[in-house]
Structure formats: structure tokens, C-alpha cells
Amino acid sequence: MVKKTIAAIFSVLVLSTVLTACNTTRGVGEDISDGGNAISGAATKAQQ
């Protein structure tokens, strides 16, 4: 019982941290897109 409670609290904390870091589900997509753009830009610079 105690292990389940601790696991539930930990899960809520992790989930809230992830959602807060990205602000919203839309923010997650923007973060991933920005990361892809940064990688693409770095690859283009490396080719030049």
C-alpha cells in the first residue's frame, strides 16, 4: 500500500514537471520543432 502511494505521488510529480516545462501539449510540439530546426541549422553550417 505504501509503495503504491509513493509510486503515485512520484508519477504525479514527474508528470507535472514535464507539463510545466513545456507549458502545454502545444508547447511540446514547438519544443521538438525548435530542436529539429537547431539540428538542421547545425548540419547546414557543417556542410558549408
From Swiss-Prot:
Residues 1-21 form the signal peptide. The keyword Coiled coil does not apply. The keyword Ligase does not apply. It is found in: Cell membrane. Pfam families: Entericidin (PF08085). Keywords: Cell membrane, Lipoprotein, Membrane, Palmitate, Signal. Its main location: membrane. A lipid is attached at C22 (N-palmitoyl cysteine). It is a lipid-anchor. It comes from the Bacteria. GO terms for biological process: response to toxic substance. One of its GO terms (cellular component) is plasma membrane. A lipid is attached at C22 (S-diacylglycerol cysteine). Belongs to the EcnA/EcnB lipoprotein family. NCBIfam families: PRK10081.1. Plays a role in the bacteriolysis. Is activated under conditions of high osmolarity by the factor sigma S. Entericidin A functions as an antidote. This is Entericidin B. It comes from Escherichia coli (strain K12).
